[in-house]
């Protein structure tokens, strides 16, 4: 399971012109699910997302986690993170999970996030989404569990 974390001042996801998820300061995470991923992969990714130190402390060092600052978590499914881009000029998606598995694991990740953290929002799995964000830094990390 891949998670592309971006520290944001704010972010929102729209589907069909309607906002389906929004946060203020926090992290936007694009989630790519692969065939070998399991609930354990989702648990490991969630632990990283909530505890990875991406926010600045009083000395300006990235020493604080999402939990510590009480920021928002916006999860957005993005199967293109699992793309094979090594050859040619067109991405291959055979390394992406089938939609049923992807939906199941994304829903699991989202439900666990809502149990573990108070400010959680999400995009809509499989939808054509427009993601708006103000990247803070920019600070971006790619996790691969």
UniProtKB/Swiss-Prot annotation:
Gene3D superfamilies: D-tyrosyl-tRNA(Tyr) deacylase (3.50.80.10). Keywords: Cytoplasm, Hydrolase, RNA-binding, tRNA-binding. A motif (Gly-cisPro motif, important for rejection of L-amino acids) lies at residues 137-138. It catalyses: glycyl-tRNA(Ala) + H2O = tRNA(Ala) + glycine + H(+); a D-aminoacyl-tRNA + H2O = a tRNA + a D-alpha-amino acid + H(+). Homodimer. A Gly-cisPro motif from one monomer fits into the active site of the other monomer to allow specific chiral rejection of L-amino acids. Belongs to the DTD family. This is D-aminoacyl-tRNA deacylase. The gene is dtd.
């Amino acid at each position: 399971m891949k998670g592309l974390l971006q520290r944001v001042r704010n972010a929102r996801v729209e589907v069909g012109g309607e906002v389906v998820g929004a946060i203020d300061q926090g992290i936007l995470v694009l989630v790519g699910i692969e065939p070998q991923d399991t609930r354990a992969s989702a648990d490991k990714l969630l632990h990283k997302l909530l505890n990875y130190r991406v926010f600045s402390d009083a000395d300006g060092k990235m020493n604080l986690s999402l939990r510590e600052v009480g920021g928002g978590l916006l999860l957005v499914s993005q199967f293109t993170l699992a793309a094979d881009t090594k050859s040619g000029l067109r991405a291959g998606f055979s390394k992406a999970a089938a939609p049923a598995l992807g939906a199941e694991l994304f829903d699991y990740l989202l439900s666990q996030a809502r149990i573990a953290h108070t400010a959680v929002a999400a995009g809509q799995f499989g939808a054509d989404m427009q993601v708006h964000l103000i990247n803070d830094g920019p600070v971006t990390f790619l996790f691969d569990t």
